[in-house]
């Protein structure tokens, strides 16, 4: 059976750290930022780490060979 391919869309959205955690950009900042608080805008600027359960699903289904 051939190797499972990595999803191209997932390659652009997720990064796997050396310790195996999955980093992703914060969501909800495409439009409508005028009504958001400054704290929300500041916090959404960076990246966040997925929970272990979500990271396991992402790696298993979308990034089987890593990046």
Swiss-Prot record:
| HAMAP family linked to this entry | Ribosomal_bL35 (MF_00514)
Q: Which GO terms describe its biological process?
A: translation
Q: Which UniProt keywords apply?
A: Ribonucleoprotein, Ribosomal protein
Task: Give the organism, scientific name.
Answer: Bartonella henselae (strain ATCC 49882 / DSM 28221 / CCUG 30454 / Houston 1)
Q: A Gene Ontology molecular-function term?
A: structural constituent of ribosome
The answer to whether the entry has keyword Manganese is: no
Q: Which family does it belong to?
A: Belongs to the bacterial ribosomal protein bL35 family.
Task: Return the Pfam families for the record.
Answer: Ribosomal_L35p
Disulfide bond residue pairs: none
Taking the record's annotation, the residue ranges forming a coiled coil are none
Write down what this protein is called.
Large ribosomal subunit protein bL35
GO CC, sorted alphabetically, is: cytosolic large ribosomal subunit
């Amino acid at each position: 059976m051939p190797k499972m391919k990595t999803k191209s869309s997932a390659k652009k959205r997720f990064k796997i750290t050396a310790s195996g955690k999955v980093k992703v950009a914060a969501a909800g900042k495409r439009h409508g930022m005028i009504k958001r608080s400054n704290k929300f805008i500041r916090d959404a600027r960076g990246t966040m780490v997925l929970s272990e359960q979500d990271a396991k699903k992402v790696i298993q289904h979308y990034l089987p060979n890593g990046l």
